Amino acid sequence: MEIKVGSIVRSKAGRDKGDFFIVLAMDDNYVYMANGELRKVDQPKKKKLKHLQGTEQVSEFIINKLSQGGKVTNSEVRKALAQAGR
């Protein structure tokens, strides 16, 4: 499963193992992700790609907002994860 901005991913390693997050930004080896609760949008978790498992789900709302240069809020991240059943 390809991981991109707006993807819902599950952590495979670390103390957040098993938790779901939304990818907010990416670079070559790392993703920056938040869940709106413990990992807030203003301090996203930096994690290596190999420590993540992609899901089939993406948040179109988050993708659209970030692509238009908007700022995503913690409540929007929580809502997107809840709508995805996570």
Give, region by region, the residue ranges found by the protein language model:
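Ferredoxin-like alpha/beta domains used as RNA- or RNAP-binding modules
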Residues: 1-5, 12, 22-86
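Short, charged beta-turn/beta-strand-edge "cap" motif at the junction between a beta-strand
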Residues: 14-17
